[in-house]
Curated annotation (Swiss-Prot):
This is ATP-dependent RNA helicase DHX15. The gene is Dhx15. It comes from Mus musculus (Mouse). A motif (DEAH box) lies at residues 260-263. Component of the U11/U12 snRNPs that are part of the U12-type spliceosome. Identified in the Intron Large spliceosome complex (IL, also named intron lariat spliceosome), a post-mRNA release spliceosomal complex containing the excised intron, U2, U5 and U6 snRNPs, and splicing factors; the association may be transient. The IL complex exists in two distinct conformations, one with the DHX15 (ILS2) and one without (ILS1). Interacts with TFIP11 (via G-patch domain); indicative for a recruitment to the IL complex. Interacts with SSB/La. Ubiquitous. Its EC number is 3.6.4.13.
Length: 795
């Protein structure tokens, strides 16, 4: 053996030759050798024991993971192969990775990973962490029963209490079912009544499926589509699915459609149920699942031809309910007081959930709670206050899942306080909530067809809503619900269930969509709760005056185009008609501004400064043109956040408006509607915009009476200009965007108009033969007479 290739046998290897005179040394060396050998044996034994323990650990971990995977309906992991295994060459093509990888810095062996069927990559460790939590949801016990019903029935009703996991898990099981079928793979749609729920649930499910949001899992809400050609599971608002049905009446893209939160009975959900009931008859391969959080599901079963019912209980704990002895005069004040008291006095850990009615109220409450807790000094526990309402951007909505602040050294408890609209009633589940404060109010749409007024009013909630709110406190452990109303009010004054939205809404948009879907016989359309005939008649009348329907009630070319815009019919008409007045660019901007939340910020501590800032944008002719000024200034200042802050403008609203404007522009381009502007230096620049406003809102006009108040034209309702208007004078004729019912009747977002435009632009509506007697009629009669004479022909 050459020196270079000789094995290094070590100095312990006995040599064949014995050196003379070294007996004593040899004995000593032998003893050393023995000691070292024993040490090595001990080391080897310890190493063997360590390896055995590692193997045992790995075996246990694999066994528990396999049990978890098998219960989830996934294949178990295989044992890892050695590098020389005959299978290793094919490991990349197998459904499991064949090698266990060694992490050098710890020496631990990680488990072989399952391949994600959607990405063809190994699942991330986070996937398994989330999977463990998923498998603890009550809904998992019912997976086999669910799959069995899904296979055997075309439609069925599923009742699952909030927190059972139905919204996140059922759609994923439907994806599994669709992937198991032969032929082209259709998608799964899951509708939500609220934008916030559609966005946050889609994000959660994308995490659970270990995919990127917007790829295999996406969402679609008005003015925002986060999906792609790869999307197989789409969460969307019910209105968006209805819009998809207009261009795809049989909804061929989907194999399963889930109507979630159906108990909320929104306008779009009710219409969708009627549409899907018909689609199911024409498509035997379509599955429809109606999901509800309340137990009054019998009505849904009967509606869908006595289909089966699957009930999944939630995991709820007892909730202690407290009422106020006397009615509260100011529920907002009482709510803030209750939050502070619970935070200071309750010795149990646990987060708070406060229900309020809208964004302004929520922002105000958040500010005041923070201020009051800060004033209490450092001895009190830290508090994290999180608002929740539909117009919050997705990343801020995700804050509700953050942990509460830690305990202080003095033992003071840190708490999370979520201040939410009724979206937290059933749509979203927030773990960790132990205390619920329920003032007993929510904003509801109310419609009076006689005077054609639809308003959002703060009204008392139903008993069903109150029960849902209380249930939020018992999700993780026994909780407490503080109702800021009396027990007598709960028992005697509250309705059992919330009135379906279809019975209290203006149906203009709905009728236009149904006509676009080819449903002409509205009287015999299968509504779950048919609306009042008068409400339907008012909707048909509105669409006829807007020229969306002809006198026979058929959809016109204009009406068909209007239906493609995700806007109220009046706004859609105004956008299309603005092309004829050379101001479609400006009307697009105004429409976008009207489609987003209020852009003017008016903080309690800086009302005067905010009002002064607003007046810098004010246009003499009114609020619509003021909104246009704000949008133009925002763009000229390069969409600056600081500029918005300095001018008391809501940056988020302006960015949303910009997004809405781009989407509406794309729809205009699709129909070859020209986007143009009148020369800014022309005296007609603002006149043309105001005329375009009249094309959509000629039915929403008020006339100033000699007594100093306004009367709405035709309906003769006494109204006043809303205090927020920039009009510093009282024009004789005003067009208004909305009628606000509060302590007084207000008209909001108003513009000064000329009566001549009314009779020229909407002669059918301003036909004097069926006009009620009033000062406005006498004025219009005179104008019509003048217009008919040649002297006024320039109009």
């Amino acid at each position: 053996m050459s020196k270079r290739h000789r094995l290094d046998l070590g100095e312990d290897y006995p040599s064949g030759k014995k050196r003379a005179g070294t007996d004593g040394k040899d004995r000593e060396r032998d003893r050393d050798r023995e000691d070292r050998s024993k040490d090595r044996d001990r080391e080897r034994d310890r190493g063997d024991r360590e390896r055995e323990r590692e193997k045992e650990k790995e075996k246990e971990l694999r066994a528990s993971t396999n049990a978890m995977l098998i219960s989830a309906g996934l294949p178990p992991l295989k044992a890892s192969h050695s590098a020389h295994s005959t299978h290793s060459a094919h490991s990349t093509h197998s459904t499991h990775s064949a090698h266990s990888t060694h992490t050098g810095h710890t020496g631990h062996t990680s488990l072989p990973q399952c391949i994600n069927p959607f990405t063809n990559l190994p699942h991330t460790p986070r996937y398994y962490d989330i999977l463990k939590k998923r498998l603890q949801l009550p809904v998992w016990e019912y997976k086999d029963r669910f799959t069995d019903i899904l296979v055997r029935h075309q439609s069925f009703v599923l009742v699952g209490e909030t927190g059972s996991g139905k919204t996140t898990q059922i759609p994923q099981w439907c994806v599994e079912y669709m992937r198991s079928l032969p032929g082209p793979k259709r998608g799964v749609a899951c509708t939500q009544p609220r934008r916030v729920a559609a966005m946050s649930v889609a994000q959660r499910v994308a995490d659970e499926m270990d995919v990127m949001l917007g790829q295999e899992v996406g969402y679609s809400i008005r003015f925002e589509d986060c999906s792609s050609a790869k999307t197989i599971l789409k969460y969307m608002t019910d209105g968006m699915l209805l819009r998809e049905a207009m261009n795809d009446p049989l909804l061929e893209r989907y194999g399963v459609i889930i109507l979630d939160e159906a108990h909320e009975r929104t306008l779009a959900t009710d219409i969708l149920m009627g549409v899907l009931k018909e689609v199911v008859r024409q498509r035997s391969d379509l599955k429809v699942i109606v999901m509800s959080a309340t137990l009054d599901a019998g009505k849904f079963q009967i509606y869908f031809d006595n289909c089966p019912l699957l009930t999944i209980p939630g995991r709820t704990h007892p909730v202690e309910i407290f009422y106020t002895p006397e009615p509260e005069r100011d529920y907002l004040e009482a709510a803030i007081r209750t939050v502070i008291q619970i935070h200071m006095c309750e010795e149990e850990e646990g987060d708070l959930l406060l229900f309020l009615t809208g964004q302004e109220e929520i922002d105000e409450a958040c500010k005041r709670i923070k201020r009051e807790v800060d004033d209490l000094g450092p001895e009190v526990g830290d508090i994290k206050i999180i608002p929740l309402y539909s117009t919050l951007p997705p990343q801020q909505q995700q804050r509700i899942f953050e942990p509460p602040p830690p305990k202080k050294q003095n033992g003071a408890i840190g708490r999370k306080v979520v201040v939410s609209t009724n979206i937290a009633e059933t749509s979203l589940t927030i773990d960790g909530v132990v205390f619920v404060i329920d003032p007993g109010f929510a904003k509801q749409k109310v419609y009076n067809p006689r005077i054609r007024v639809e308003s959002l009013l703060v009204t008392a909630i139903s008993k069903a809503s109150a029960q849902q709110r209380a249930g939020r406190a018992g999700r993780t452990r026994p909780g407490k619900c503080f109702r800021l109303y009396t027990e007598k009010a709960y028992k005697t004054e509250m309705q059992d269930n919330t009135y379906p939205e279809i019975l209290r809404s203006n149906l203009g948009s709905v009728v236009l969509q149904l006509k676009k879907l080819g449903i002409d016989d509205l009287v015999h359309f299968d509504f779950m709760d048919p609306p009042a005939p008068e409400t339907l008649m008012r909707a048909l009348e509105l669409l006829n005056y807007l020229a969306a329907l002809n006198d026979d009630g058929d959809l016109t070319e204009l009406g068909s185009m209007m239906a493609e815009f995700p806007l109220d019919p009046q706004l859609a008409k105004m956008v299309i008609a603005s092309c004829d007045y050379n101001c479609s660019n400006e009307v697009l901007s105004i429409t976008a501004m009207l489609s987003v939340p209020q852009c003017f910020v008016r903080p309690t501590e800086a009302k005067k400064a905010a009002d002064e800032a607003k007046m810098r944008f004010a246009h003499i002719d009114g609020d619509h043109l003021t909104l246009l000024n704000v949008y133009h200034a925002f763009k000229q200042n390069h969409e600056s956040v600081q500029w918005c802050y300095d001018n008391f403008i809501n940056y988020r609203s302006l960015m949303s408006a910009d997004n809405v404007r781009q989407q509406l522009s794309r729809i205009m381009d699709r129909f070859n509607l020209p986007r143009r502007s009148t020369d800014f230096t022309s005296r007609d620049y603002y006149i043309n915009i105001r005329k375009a406003l009249v094309t959509g809102y000629f039915m929403q006009v008020a006339h100033l009476e000699r007594t100093g108040h306004y009367l709405t034209v035709k309906d003769n309702q006494v109204v006043q200009l809303h205090p927020s208007t920039v009009l510093d004078h009282k024009p004789e004729w005003v067009l208004y965007n909305e009628f606000v019912l509060t302590t007084k009747n207000y008209i909001r977002t108003c513009t000064d108009i000329k009566p001549e435009w009314l009779v020229k632009i909407a002669p059918q509506y301003y036909d004097m033969s069926n006009f009620p007697q009033c000062e406005a009629k006498r004025q219009l009669d005179r104008i019509i007479a003048k217009l008919q004479s040649k002297e006024y022909s320039q109009y």
